[in-house]
Amino acid sequence: MMSTNFHWPTTNKNDNREVSIETPTSTDPHVPRDSLASMPHATASTTIKKRKRDDELDGDKSTTTTTTTTTVSSSSTRKYLQSSLGSSKFKKAKTPKISGQPLPLPRLIESLDRSNLQKLVQGLIAVHPELQSTLIKISPRPSIQDSIQLLQDKFDMIISHLPYKCDVESDYSYLRIKPHLQEFLSSVSDFILNYLPPLETNMTRSLQFLHEATKLVYNLPNFTNQEFQYTKSTALEQIANCWLIVLSQDEEKDGNTDVVKVIHELELLEKLHEHNEISFNKFEKVVDYCKDKLEQHELIMNNNEAGSGVPSSISDLITVDYSKYSIANTTSI
């Protein structure tokens, strides 16, 4: 039977103290396992304590190593981030700087509504008055529909400011809407002048606008205030004169058949009778003028139909042999 050098601990009969030798937990290759058993008690205890210290030192070393590794890793990460930041800064330096800037003028004008655009143009004229004539030249002329719509809006503004709990025709009502009334009448005057000859050469356009503007004026509330009555009467008289100016613009032309054609096409005689009745005969001269033109035209047409063989113009009625009045014939007489 093979024997080993390892011996189990025994109890000495002469010594009552027990010596317990613990098996070392460390497996140090430099210390044989059997030599530990044969060591004396003090030496073994010292060795065991030393082993424990070594184990603790090994643990501290591993912790230190881990901490060092973590520190190194953190340092490496920090260096990587710094290098990344440095590279990103380098890239930003190459990228052109983008900063905010105002809208271009065409985009700015596109974004403005009617009210703000009007304020912009008026402010521009206030700063640079010399631009007024240029703006008038380059701006397009408003259409009849747009012109009438603007006057209608100003008329509606008057109606909307009338008091609810008061007589509409009272002085209080008139004083309340007076600023809006003045603005309305001023606009009517400006637009009428815009549709008069020689600026407006189309008689039909001028008369169409005058008809709509006349209706708006006499549809105003009939305030009892004397100032309003005088203002309204004067305005209607001036509008009636403008009708005469438009109708007589081609009076110098031979025949002047355009006005008769327009009177028939627009049914002006019926409309003027209505205006004259509502305005208390303010349009009587205009009605008489239209009647006179229609009568003259009818007389000419009747004469042409009666004498179909007669020339239609005065120059054709007169035929003169000018050879009798030559210088040679005169001297021979």
UniProtKB/Swiss-Prot annotation:
Chain positions covered by the region annotation Disordered: 1-76
Molecular functions (GO terms): proteasome binding
Ranges of Polar residues composition bias in the record: 1-13
Gene Ontology biological process terms in this record: nuclear protein quality control by the ubiquitin-proteasome system; proteasome localization; protein transport
UniProt subcellular location: Cytoplasm; Nucleus
Record field: compositional bias (Low complexity): 62-76
Keywords linked to the UniProt accession: Cytoplasm, Nucleus, Protein transport, Transport
InterPro entries: Cut8/Sts1_fam, Cut8/Sts1_sf
Pfam families in the record: Cut8
Broad class of the protein's primary localization: cytoplasm
One CC-aspect GO term: cytoplasm
PANTHER family for this protein: FI02826P
Quaternary structure note: Binds the proteasome.
Chain's role: Involved in ubiquitin-mediated protein degradation. Regulatory factor in the ubiquitin/proteasome pathway that controls the turnover of proteasome substrates. Targets proteasomes to the nucleus and facilitates the degradation of nuclear proteins.
Family recorded in the similarity comment: Belongs to the cut8/STS1 family.
Protein name: Tethering factor for nuclear proteasome STS1
Organism: Candida dubliniensis (strain CD36 / ATCC MYA-646 / CBS 7987 / NCPF 3949 / NRRL Y-17841) (Yeast)
